[in-house]
Amino acid sequence: MQKLMDYFFKRKLKVPRPISNDISVRVKNLYAVYDEKQENQLVALNNISYDFKKNKIYFIIGNSGSGKSTLVTHFNGLMISRYGFVQVGDIVSGDHFDFERQLLGVIDSYDKKIINLLWRNQLDQWTFLVLFSNEVNIQQARILFEANFKQKPISLKFIKTKNNHELITNPYVRENTKIAVVRVDKNVILEINDKMNYEELQRFEFIKKEIKTNYHLSKKIKRFKELRRRVGFVFQFPEYQLFKDTIEKDIMFGPVNLGVKKSEAKKRAKFYLNKLGLGDDYLERSPFGLSGGQKRRVAIAGILAIQNDILVFDEPTAGLDPAGEHEMMQIILDAKANNKTVFVITHTMEHVLEVADEVIVMDEGEIIKTGTPYEIFFDQHIINSTSIQVPRVIAVINELIKKDLKYEILKQKQPRTIEELADAIIEFKKGEK
């Protein structure tokens, strides 16, 4: 009986995976796949791994459709991936489905010995032969092919290598692998380097690495409310977060739902509404009669009232006038000053330069570069390969440098606003005299 009591009442919570105290959000081998079981599946996130540090302002930028919103919606469990995971403290959202080294290589289908084997198996019409671990199924093989080669397969099926002694002579490799025959669109030119010829295929050494999975445990997060308490999400459209008959009730909803007493939630509603520039008289008003900017403030007050450690803003300045944009940037800076970690998705590069501690650039579901605003905006390859437009400050510095290399010194000063740039130029001119 005592053992039974110990089991139910004395079990200690274990941290699923150790994580450093300075890490706010850990993303590990994260894939996001839409319509996974369909042939037209979309790999929206492709094997993303990154450790986001605490008490920093991250701006996530990139072309539309690059995976920015998909990434951040995993942070508080709005989306949960079957492949890879997000960790916030001791809470893991997602599945440790280890895709690493499951796509083992591409076989050279133009090798003479391979051609003969293909012909015997009536597979000469297929475009690519890809060697996979036995651990993956067809859907996962399609995901890995698209993720690695940026091309959707039109069709994919497996050759069973177990009984095909000619194709793979090593019995251990034959037992633990399978070959997919993959066809892509005939109009697509897909060049894959480092293909294995027949001899290399026979010399291939396979190290079995099982896929670890806990999806059946983690798809329903037992500590889901705790995750929402830690990570607050401000949507692009505030209407998503306003649905009560009074502003006070809307702001109170999050805290009360997460276990805060009503009396405390009422205090927080008043405090954060005032903090965002709206008086007590707004508390009993309907949120539906507010302007767009006022709705945004109420929605943010509702998130701040939860007192999260992490805040995510999706296009926070969309539809705001310049004064509203300035207020929003100040809210973000205030959040950092209160020891919060902030993530901002935006297409407004002026705000990135003014406020960001670190910039994350995404493209085709991958993080392609990280760095300070100056490291990003002076990377010509990034600017040319994306739709990112440099802020006015950077554009002016570029023009000055074209006219005279002495203005390179402005890059060291790193002004973030037009006013700071003007001050830096005046200071530089004084130094020349």
UniProtKB/Swiss-Prot annotation:
It is a peripheral membrane protein. One of its GO terms (molecular function) is ATP hydrolysis activity. Its main location: membrane. SMART domains: AAA. InterPro entries: AAA+_ATPase, ABC_transporter-like_ATP-bd, ABC_transporter-like_CS, ABC_transpr_CbiO/EcfA_su, ECF_ABC_transporter_ATP-bd, P-loop_NTPase. It is found in: Cell membrane. The keyword Membrane applies. Its EC number is 7.-.-.-. PROSITE patterns: ABC_TRANSPORTER_1, ABC_TRANSPORTER_2, CBIO. One of its GO terms (cellular component) is ATP-binding cassette (ABC) transporter complex. It is an enzyme of class 7 (translocase). Keywords: ATP-binding, Cell membrane, Membrane, Nucleotide-binding, Translocase, Transport. ATP binds at residues 62-69. ATP-binding (A) component of a common energy-coupling factor (ECF) ABC-transporter complex. Unlike classic ABC transporters this ECF transporter provides the energy necessary to transport a number of different substrates. PANTHER family: ENERGY-COUPLING FACTOR TRANSPORTER ATP-BINDING PROTEIN ECFA2, HEAVY METAL TRANSPORTER. Forms a stable energy-coupling factor (ECF) transporter complex composed of 2 membrane-embedded substrate-binding proteins (S component), 2 ATP-binding proteins (A component) and 2 transmembrane proteins (T component). Belongs to the ABC transporter superfamily. Energy-coupling factor EcfA family. This is Energy-coupling factor transporter ATP-binding protein EcfA2. The gene is ecfA2.
